[in-house]
Amino acid sequence: MSNFVKKNHNVENYFISKEFIPFTTEKASFINLPNHNRHIGFWLSNKFIYPSEKHSKQVAIGLIYDNSYPIVKYDENLKRHIWKYLTGTELINLYNQYKQNYFTKMKKALFSSEPKKVKANNNNNNLTNWSVEKEQELINDLKDLN
């Protein structure tokens, strides 16, 4: 047998910020949902959480597409309530939407002060809308430069 490992096509290794994991036990970690309070999320076995080799502030989480994950909400007394169930695909879409919104907001914040691009006319000859007098004035100005 070779050392070939068959990739499970039903699992997505998805990278998230470590900030989404507020606490960890020996066996599992609580992962917050994006854009929700810090007390709403899901538990994931530590077997499915891997450190990122390239980015120290990220981890990869292994989400099974068609698995049902109970979304847990904790009240002020830390009593656990199952809020709803989401599939792995729905969780991935939720994190993708969060990332897309984040990058859109960052782009607006970083580049909002830059001048806007002006749309050019479709015709390449900018003199077409000028009057004959204006064209002659431009020609005379160019002659004066020589």
Swiss-Prot record:
It holds the Pfam family DUF3627. InterPro entries: DUF3627. Belongs to the plectrovirus ORF4 family. This is Uncharacterized protein ORF4.
